[in-house]
Amino acid sequence: RKNSHEQILSAFSDGEADILVGTQMIVKGHDFPDVTLVGVLAADMSLYASDYTAAEKTFQLLCQAAGRAGRGKNPGEVVIQTYAPDNYSIIAASHQDYDEFFEQEIVYRKLMGYPPVANMVSVLLQCSGESELEMATESVVQLIRKVKEQKYNELFVIGPADPPVSKINDIYRKIIYLKS
């Protein structure tokens, strides 16, 4: 229902509800001083996204969730359920240690040549027809190859490939990554 999440958050904030169950959305931008316990289920799910920033996003989300507990007079507690308790982003988030996370993440980024140690651009192509998308993708790939040969030999091309969600609302999608 329209505005239902605002009503639920308001009821929780006003003390009309003692337990709030929600998605990632509730950890951002809300201040509930009486919250003393935060539980995060399947905290490692975002680690498996096909995105080089997956560990960073997991770390951020867990730190934001942990920041919801103990904001008022009473101390807070955070319980994290995970299938990857040895993952560096989970460990660093459990300590809320940004330096610990960065030290591990920057090693990974350097090894893989990902930002901030390299430049990276994603080119998302979308068309209503699958055959049109294939033709457009081939044209873009040829253009990229031509530019690479003429000016940017150090350019590394990944793809084209299907993105994690390759069709949305009858729109077909392809993605190409460029690294330098």
What is each PLM-predicted segment?
Residues L178-S180:
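Short, intrinsically disordered, charge-balanced linker/junction segments flanking boundaries
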Residues K151, K167-Y172:
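Nucleotide-binding motor/catalytic cores of P-loop/tubulin-like NTPases across gene-expression machines
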Residues V147-P163:
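Short beta-strand elements
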